[in-house]
Amino acid sequence: MKPRHKKLAIIASSVTALGVASVLVLNAFQSNLVFFFSPTQVANNEAPVGKSFRIGGLVEEGSVKRQADGVTVNFLVTDTAKVIPVVYTGILPDLFKEGKGVVAQGKLASDGIFRADEVLAKHDENYMPPEAAGALDQADKARKTVMQ
C-alpha cells in the first residue's frame, strides 16, 4: 500500500470512528432528556403520551388520597388554570403537602392520568422550581384575562 493510500485509509477510519462516537453520544443524550410541562400544557395535549417528562405545579387542596396498600397515592396537580390527576407509588417526600409546590416525573397514560415515577417537593416555603413558578404565573394571567 502506498503512503498516499495509507493516509486516506487513516483519515477515512478516523472520520468513521468520529461519526459513530457522535451518534452514540447524541443517542445517549436524547434518551436522558426530560422536558417540563405545566398542567395547562398537558391538558392542551402538548405533552407526549407514553414518554417521560416532568409536570409541576401545586398539589390541589383536598386532593391527596392514599390507597389501601399504603404506598400508592393519588393527587391532583394544578397551575390554577388546569388540573391533572397523578398516581404515585412510593414514599412521598416529607415536604409533600396539599397547596404546596411539587414536580413529578413520569409518563402520561392514554387515560389522561400522569403516572409518576418520582415526586419532588419544594424544600422551603419560598422555593418553587423556576419552570413551575413560570407556569403558575402564565396560568394565573390567562385565568384573570378570561375572567375580565
Curated annotation (Swiss-Prot):
Family designation: Belongs to the CcmE/CycJ family.
Source species, domain of life: Bacteria
SUPFAM superfamilies in the record: Heme chaperone CcmE
Residue spans, topological domain Periplasmic: 29-148
Bilayer disposition of the protein: Single-pass type II membrane protein
Binding-site residues for heme, renumbered to this chain: H123, Y127
Transmembrane segments: 8-28
Residues in the Cytoplasmic compartment per record: 1-7
NCBIfam families (alphabetical): PRK13254.1-1 (NF009727), PRK13254.1-3 (NF009729), PRK13254.1-5 (NF009731)
Name of this protein: Cytochrome c-type biogenesis protein CcmE
CC per GO annotation: plasma membrane
Biological processes, Gene Ontology terms: cytochrome complex assembly
Function statement: Heme chaperone required for the biogenesis of c-type cytochromes. Transiently binds heme delivered by CcmC and transfers the heme to apo-cytochromes in a process facilitated by CcmF and CcmH.
Pfam families on file: CcmE (PF03100)
Record-linked Gene3D superfamilies: Nucleic acid-binding proteins (2.40.50.140)
Cited PANTHER family: CYTOCHROME C-TYPE BIOGENESIS PROTEIN CCME HOMOLOG, MITOCHONDRIAL (PTHR34128:SF2)
Organism, scientific name: Nitrosospira multiformis (strain ATCC 25196 / NCIMB 11849 / C 71)
Record localization: Cell inner membrane
Gene giving rise to this polypeptide: ccmE
Keywords: Cell inner membrane, Cell membrane, Cytochrome c-type biogenesis, Heme, Iron, Membrane, Metal-binding, Signal-anchor, Transmembrane, Transmembrane helix
GO MF annotation, one: heme binding
